[in-house]
Amino acid sequence: MTQIAYFDCPTGIAGNMCLGALVDAGVPLSYLEQQLQRLSLSEPYQLVATPVLRQGMAATYVEVQIEAAPHAHRHLSHIVALIEAAGLPDRVRDWSIAVFQQLAIAEAAVHGVTPEQVHFHEVGATDAIVDIVGTCLGLDYLGIEAVYCSALPTGGGTVKAAHGQLSVPVPAVLRLWQLRQVPVYSNGIERELVTPTGAAIAVTLAKSFGPPPSLQLQKTGWGAGSHDLPIPNLLKLWIGTASDLVMTPQSPEGSLETVQVIETQIDDCSPQVLAYVSEQLLAQGALEVFSQAITMKKGRLGTLLTIICQPDQQAACETILFRETTTIGLRFRREQRRVLPRRRDRVQTPWGEVRVKVAGDPQSPLTVQPEYEDCRAIAQAQQIALHHIQTVAQQQWQQENA
């Protein structure tokens, strides 16, 4: 089962909050310290974890205490070289570099330079490097395979930075949100709630933003922010395994499950390509794939392709769509569907065995459907009408289960 981490961020996200939540969830501080020493950072520092209360809620506050006040300003190439030379686990190395690369892209767009020319200030400091690499170490230690994140609060007010007094959210954070079209909202708190480091971690590592995915919750971690706020300043980390179904209590009408719906409109793919794509999506694990004829702009005839899949299959389905079709954009949303309990039975007909799909309450099933492929094979072999085979199989099941 896929191991999932979900960052629940009602008061935002920062690198040290991620570290605090991971330590609170069971990542040993000693492990982080040992691994981070491999970075050979020139500035002496201490990694300190402290149990704290935020509005009466217990959490772990992690702080990178720098022994020397000035901090180094580094370019992306310097940081990448540090990480690559550290001998970290492969996933940690790749994740950490990806976070800094994403941050460099955002900073470059803000300042009108290339990512290679970006001169990191706060995020090139020792504490930011420790926060980012430490977070990746913690996720790797817990065996996390997929990261998700809630919508993020915008915050407000101003903050002092290397470029002077900046309004919140700061430009780099806004650009990071824009790159991933992160859902944001105001919770009314006038303070910096999402730092560039926290935004870069979320934007780079999270597969999607919004409600939690379907998972069986195993543990939680609570990471404290630096300040007391009107609501508990906590990042809540949920750890669990991907669950195929998130169900309400059983009802005669079946159970609810959360699914992901992906849609795209295409007007320049052949029917053969669309059929092939549908096969690929179903083979990947999509629950349903269907198409509808539509009229697009300028009166063009097109196809609306819709995919329904489990939330943790979204990324894989998106990869297939972008690779195999001409689409340049996708829409997606979470929905719920109600599913009847289902099982497969077998019945013996005069011509051989037929599988039967039964849906509904075991004592009073609502639908009984003979398997088409079995009936088709018999009909072709025996030269008997298909509908007759289906009727006989259904009647046989009714007799055996009367």
From Swiss-Prot:
It comes from Synechococcus elongatus (strain ATCC 33912 / PCC 7942 / FACHB-805) (Anacystis nidulans R2). This is Putative nickel insertion protein. Keywords: Nickel. The keyword Amino-acid biosynthesis does not apply. GO terms for molecular function: lyase activity; nickel cation binding. It comes from the Bacteria. Coiled coil: none annotated. Belongs to the LarC family. Pfam families: Ni_insertion. The keyword Transcription regulation does not apply.
